[in-house]
């Protein structure tokens, strides 16, 4: 029996559970894209699937709305896939294991994908209904939002006529997003030179950090949580100061827009220095625990000996350059907004640290609501990377979404909210990328607001979606569509 079958609105939770049963990690969205196409064809709706996998579905206006401006319902089909160490799952072949606990839906030790599966579920439920009044609809579901909004960047809009865009990719009920930061993905490629291990009595050691809370690198960067990659870079530098080490393996984080929760390094050291290494880690553990006692109270550094023999190591120059890059590259909040003191204006997150055969890649999500500051951060990364012998690349650049002084859609949504709930919604500009900016750049007269039901800890295995908030947001959405004549 379906886990969510008894929940209202039934159509929304039915489609959400179906979506959760289809693998749809970023860069692995063909199955979910084809599912959306089949859905539309079964209902004789116009559908276009582009080469990227983006899907556009159109539904005619209901009676009385034939002359109303066209409305776009927009979200993304991909999700961030994260799990705890003890969870066995193949995100490429298996669906999620949903859990319903009272008012909360979550997945068993994995991310839930409410970001942004709930938007897709809303859209499908509206497309499938025959009793919901609405203007002509253009449902636009994009791919690869979570890895740089690549689908929205690549989509063509010549066949779209929407005047209003409802973006269902926000996680705070009662908040209407009316602007966002721009951003890019920046990568520092540090070369590796391998050599035979020439230490007299080498001992292999593994250093790791875990117990961090992580989170979304835009929405939660303001919480100043520890970054596993930066923390281990700092730890390696402390070890390097105490002993002669050679790096063997380095790994931490796979998503530039998720603050990394854990990371590991493998290195070799002379046997006589292993106790010195352990003492250096123990000393730094006390320091880091004190620094992050509020934001990451369970941060833990671990050092242990490896059992396998090591034949090749990074030479001193390439290993030292990698450690220096991890220590020196900027990370976290760089500037708060002068106009809105509670808003992060500029930040970056070292979310990806992965080793290829001949290089280590350090991937950043760079964000700013001021384009020149975003470009300056990119320049800093490039300059330092190249100074240390690496190469720099960037991709996924997207524009900021600037606040509009006049917005009919915003006015309607505020009025509906006040009538339904007796209070004013919070109008906000956020330090995170949403696809609105890209669509508004392509469709100059588009009027857009982003909103959604209450979710917590997105992009982590603790992600939770609140049932009653979904119900209220559904009611809110239907009333908005009813008013947009």
Functional labels for PLM-detected ranges:
Residues 220, 227-229, 234-250, 378, ...:
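Active-site-adjacent substrate-binding region
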């Amino acid at each position: 029996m379906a886990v969510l079958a008894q929940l209202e609105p039934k159509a929304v939770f039915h489609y959400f559970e179906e979506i959760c049963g289809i693998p749809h990690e970023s860069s692995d969205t063909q199955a979910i894209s084809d599912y959306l196409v089949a859905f539309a064809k079964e209902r004789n709706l116009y559908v276009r699937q582009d080469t990227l996998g983006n899907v556009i579905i159109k539904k005619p206006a209901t009676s009385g709305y034939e002359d109303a401006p066209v409305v776009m319902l927009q979200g993304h089909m991909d999700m961030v896939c994260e799990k705890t160490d003890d969870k066995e799952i193949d995100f490429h072949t298996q669906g999620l294991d949903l859990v319903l606990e009272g008012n909360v839906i979550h997945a068993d030790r994995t991310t839930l994908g409410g970001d942004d599966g709930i938007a897709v579920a809303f859209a499908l439920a509206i497309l499938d209904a025959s009793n919901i009044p609405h203007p002509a609809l253009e449902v636009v579901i994009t791919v690869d939002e979570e890895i740089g909004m690549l689908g929205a960047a690549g989509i063509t809009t010549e066949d779209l006529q929407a005047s209003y865009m409802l973006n269902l990719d926000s996680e705070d009920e009662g908040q209407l997003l009316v602007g966002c930061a721009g951003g890019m993905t920046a990568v520092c490629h540090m070369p590796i030179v391998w050599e035979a291990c020439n230490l007299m009595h080498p001992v292999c050691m593994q250093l790791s950090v875990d117990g961090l809370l992580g989170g979304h690198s835009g929405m939660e960067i303001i919480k100043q949580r520890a970054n596993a990659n930066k923390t281990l870079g700092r730890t390696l530098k402390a070890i390097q100061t105490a002993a002669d080490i050679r790096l063997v393996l380095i790994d931490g984080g796979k998503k530039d827009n998720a603050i990394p929760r854990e990371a590991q390094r493998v290195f070799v050291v002379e046997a006589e220095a292993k106790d010195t290494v352990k003492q250096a880690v123990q000393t730094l553990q006390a320091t880091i625990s004190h620094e992050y006692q509020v934001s990451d109270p369970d941060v833990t550094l671990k050092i242990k000996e490896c059992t396998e023999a090591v034949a090749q190591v990074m030479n001193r120059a390439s290993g030292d350059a990698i450690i220096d890059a991890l220590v020196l590259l900027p990370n976290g909040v760089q500037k708060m907004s002068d106009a809105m003191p509670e808003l992060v204006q500029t930040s970056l997150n070292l979310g990806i640290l992965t080793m290829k055969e001949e290089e280590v890649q350090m991937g950043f999500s760079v964000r700013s609501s001021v384009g020149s500051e975003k470009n300056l951060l990119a320049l800093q990364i490039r300059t330092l990377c190249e100074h240390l012998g690496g190469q720099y690349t960037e991709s996924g650049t997207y524009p900021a979404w600037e606040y509009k002084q006049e917005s009919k859609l915003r006015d309607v949504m505020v009025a509906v909210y006040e009538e339904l709930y007796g209070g004013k919604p919070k109008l906000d500009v956020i330090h995170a990328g949403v696809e609105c900016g890209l669509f508004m750049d392509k469709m100059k007269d588009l009027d857009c607001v982003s909103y959604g039901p209450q979710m917590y800890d997105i992009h982590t295995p603790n992600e939770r979606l609140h049932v009653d908030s979904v119900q209220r947001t559904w009611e809110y959405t239907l009333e908005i569509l009813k008013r947009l004549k």
